[in-house]
Amino acid sequence: MGVNGYAGYTGSTHWNQDSRQLGEGTTALRSFVLQNIVQDNTWELDRITKYYLYWKFYEGLHYKDFNDGLLSFNYVRAFIDKVNMFLLGDEAFTFHVQNYYSTQISKETEKLAEEIMMYHWGKSNKLQLSYEILQMGGITGDVWLGVDWIEEEKYCRVSVFDSRQCFVTFENGDFNKVESFMVRQPLDRKSNENGYTLFVQKWTNDKVETWYQKDAAINSDNVTKYDQKEYENPYGFIPVVHIKNKPNSSGYYGKSDANDILKINKVYNELMQQLKAVIDYHVTPTTVITGASAKSLKKGLGQIWSGLPAEANVFNLGLDVDLSATVNYAKDLKTALHELSDVPENALGKIQAISNTSAAALQITYHPLMQQANIKAMTYGEGIVKVNSMILRILKVKDPENKRLKQLLKQEPDFLEENMIKPVFAFGFPKDRTDELNRAQMELNMKISSRREIMERMGKQNIPELLEEIDEDAIEQGLLQARISQALHEMMGGSDEGDEEEEDETPIPDEEDIDGEETPDNGENEE
């Protein structure tokens, strides 16, 4: 079947005819999935086969066989990693509390919520976890995040499930109502005495079920279960979040970053391999001798042949084949890869003279990459919001005496219903720090922005505490400046103040001393 058959439709005969190598490889991959992953569901078989195909290309296995000896330009991996790292930057993301009804959030409320999220995501290794989330989603098009309560360390662990082992069922086919979620862990048969191949965990809103199995069937009602355990779901919801890599309004599952470039990358590699074969053939030239015997002639550097017949002719086969059309076609394929992936050539290291390039021109050049990053910020951001909400809901069940949680709910009893904790992605686009600070200063002077908004834009973490620290520093600097000014004033103007005090202590002569006679008061004048 062709790649266009992965959505559940019949593969195209024309596609198989044009790409027989890809068809053979896909057939072998499909057989592997059928034997080891899915045995009883054709549609899921197509989905999982697609996931495995994307992963093989990401890992550089672009051929059915002999991948080590064949030339392979792994643009699938380069493009996926570039978009992901462009979104994450150095710090991945920070947290920001947003109210559904208002933009005004108490500083103390935001501080408590951010501290809770920083703790649980930090314990889950946020930076590496963030990369794995975008990696799994970028390759397969879908990523499932699970939230587990770790009793020993009192935190909610966020983890990434392998999309190739995740299976979802819905209520009456409604994608908005997940009925159950099942994740499987492949096992090595040699490592266990019972011959188990899979460990399975299945969640519903009411219960959690775990078991081992020896076959690859996914229908839990018909499969033989070993060491089966079942217990009540303490949360009342399935602690798993599904994130689409790219929006797909036609169904539940998302779109992979490799969806549009995989076939082109495959053809490009095959073409470059053929060009390499032509060049390799002419690197060690073949010597042609006519009209003479080659038995006594030694080929090599510094060898001199003499005594050849006059009609003899000796020459090397040269590269006289015109490869310009092939080279131009390879360039067209390379250009198409960049156009369809929205990753400019400059983003992968192509040298560009940017000394006289304006910031606006650079933004236009990198706009496709920024557009892809913005789409992922939307889809993954909404998924992380759901994960943050689950963390708080699990805390209410597993650790209701949590100090910060109690303070948060005391200040905002309806916090979970009226607020969301959003991620603010760092974005790795090169920035002119001086220009950014000048623009921030101008916005503050014009009173069209706040310090908090500017800090969020710059990717600062723990903004409420940072603002308090800045204000405290400003107050301390003001008090220190006041004390310094007072000390300088006393040092420079202390003598003048002393003279004024002495003048004040000198008795003022009355009019009798000045005129030589006493001025009568009102009573004497009346007399």
Model-based region annotation:
Residues 1-161, 165-166, 176, 522-525:
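Extended, helix-rich architectural segments
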Residues 43-64, 182-219, 302-316:
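An N-terminal domain-start capping segment
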Residues 108-113, 121-129, 260, 264-267, ...:
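Short amphipathic alpha-helical segments
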Residues 131-250:
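Extended, regular secondary-structure scaffolds
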Residues 220-364:
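Extended, charged amphipathic alpha-helical segments
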Residues 303-310, 321-325, 329-527:
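C-terminal helix-loop subdomains that flank or include functional centers
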